[in-house]
Amino acid sequence: EGGEVKRLTTEPGGHGCAVAPDGATFVDTFSSRERAAVTTLRRTDGGEVIATLHEEPDMAATAQGLRPPELRVMEAADGIPMFGALYRPEGEGPHPLVVSVYGGPHAQRVLDDWALTVDLRAQYLAQAGFLVLAVDNRGSANRGLAFEAHLHRRMGTIEVDDQVAAVEQVVAEGLADPERVGIYGWSYGGYMTCMSLMRAPEVFRVGVAGAPVVDWDGYDTGYTERYMSTPEDNPDGYRDGAVTTHVEGLSGKLLLVHGMVDENVHFRHTARLITALTAAQKPYDIQIFPEERHMPRDAAGLEYMERRLVSYFEEHLLA
């Protein structure tokens, strides 16, 4: 029948719970940007901690030499609030800026949890002298249907507008150098990287696109048609949302990264993009992993990819 909602956990950060079958107790795992996950057993009547089941000693962010990112509320292109995280390098700005992007539905990246602090790629880039920005644009998860529905029938449009708006805000604060802005992402984030370079070349100068969706008519229909309907019903949306439609806009540096046995975003997407870039006489760089799937899993491949990504930004934004 429902009733008054009562908060049972008070620790800052994100909590995930599993309730016992009898409803008397629950297991709570929580973390924040300042500390790693702690797992406790609690009573549902008041939230009292019965026992601490797991806690990593000495895992505070400062003990690991990590600087937790700064959480902030930013404005989307239409003025509504969106959440961002900023990893600051040492020294005063303006700094070269690298945007870490996903941007698609079903995901919320900016949370007060340990995973945000131990994003080692973002931390590595910050230690190399880059300001790193992550933003959950309109269309991302856990903000309600209206927030998600902004991308209905128009993927690849408002998400880019919001990332541009976020960049403009950190530039206006004097934190970022507008002439040295890069972007990277994987899967939908790879798609966003390509679309940002091509639809906003005056903002984004360098991008690393991992396993990018290139044309929505070549991706999982159960996912795509939920947001875009069918190509027959929404031809304009599919055309405007295709990376291949916008290749003429590319003027910056683009590194494509893809595994050739990717079962999620098939390699045909990158192959299509290469064909379109060649036809438009647009230069690009590419890193192929012949035996990898949606992203490298082999330790050597992971290390190689991370070194290549960082060196690409260093070459084109720090030099």
Describe the residue ranges of each PLM region.
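Blade-edge beta-strand/turn elements of extracellular beta-propeller
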Residues: 3-10
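Serine-hydrolase catalytic core recognition
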Residues: 9, 16-319
